[in-house]
Structure formats: C-alpha cells, structure tokens
A protein has these predicted regions:
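Carbohydrate-interacting/catalytic domains
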Residues: 2-3, 8, 12-175
Length: 175
C-alpha cells in the first residue's frame, strides 16, 4: 500500500527467502536461475502461504483511490522504530496503515497522527475500519497499537469521515 505499484517474485507467496549465497540480496530459488515447481495446494492447506494476504491487499488497493497514487504519502509519528505508520488521501478517501517491521516479535507503540493530513481537526475522533480484520475502532490524535507477526502484522484502516457510521465494536479499542 506504500506504493501504487508493486510486484513479487514467484515463490515469495510461499515465503521462500534462501539467499543465493551468504549476504546476497538475490534468492536461490529465483526464476532468474531455475524453473522451480511449487506446490501451491499443499502450502495453502498447511497455512504456509501469504497468497490470501496478498489477494486481500490487492482487493483493498483496488477499492481505495487513495492507494492509486504515489505523491499523497504522509508519515505519522510512532514511538517505536519497529512500527511504521503512514496515510494516503485522495479526495474523501483516506487510508491509514500501521505495519510491524519486525517479522519475529510482537511490537507495541503509540501512534501520533497528523490530523490535518487526514483532513481532520486536531482534536477530532473518528471511526477507523480495519480492512484486513473487519474490526472498527475509534481513533483520535494518539492511539495504542500492538501488532503480532503471523497473526496481525498490520492494520489497513479506512478512515471514516465524521458523517460515517459509528464503530461496530462499541468504541475505542486496542488493536
């Protein structure tokens, strides 16, 4: 969601990441070096594929005009360098993303939003709907986040305008 265009190498969906050699950024199983048959069905059955997540992210990207542009990217402060927070806004469509950059450990942080960048008043509170989980939270200028790799590595929030529906979970929530 950071960039409007992206792609992945075949096999990445199966989390293949063995380097070609020590310290190399190139992958051993890259189609650059070989053709490798992959067992997609077994990976799906065993839960060792991120293909459903990639599919969901692509669906979210198609649904939100804010994610179709590059120059509308704005970063928001986190008090933990292992988490990144950014937003994209196009007209009334506002998407806020928080990602755990640590693939091994759960990370927590307070996210401080630049409310005017979201088209909101500094002290406003709005419902944010997580497009990955379906949950809705009430967020204001500062918000607590806890993200676990393998379970909830990110939030992709659709920021609901003040006239939008109230949160489904009854108010502020810990993510």
């Amino acid at each position: 969601t950071l960039s409007p265009t992206w792609g992945i190498y075949s096999g990445y969906e199966l989390c293949e990441n063995t380097p070609l050699r020590e310290g190399s950024e190139e992958y051993l199983d890259s189609e650059k070096y070989q053709l490798k048959p992959r067992d997609w069905a077994t990976a799906a059955r065993e839960g060792t594929t991120i293909a459903p997540l990639v599919t969901r992210l692509n669906t979210i990207r198609r649904a939100h005009p804010a994610l179709h542009r590059l120059r509308n990217l704005r970063f928001h402060h986190t008090d933990n360098d292992a988490l990144i927070a950014y937003s994209k806004r196009e007209g009334s469509d506002v998407v806020l993303v928080v990602v755990n950059l640590d693939p091994h450990r759960t990370q927590e942080a307070t996210i401080s939003l630049d409310m005017p960048q979201l088209g909101l008043d500094r002290h406003e509170s709005v419902p944010v709907h997580d497009e990955l989980t379906g949950r809705t939270y009430q967020w204001g200028r500062t918000n607590y986040v806890r993200l676990e790799p393998g379970r909830a590595p990110a939030h992709v929030f659709h920021v609901r305008r003040p006239s939008a529906a109230a949160p489904q979970n009854g108010g502020a929530g810990v993510s």
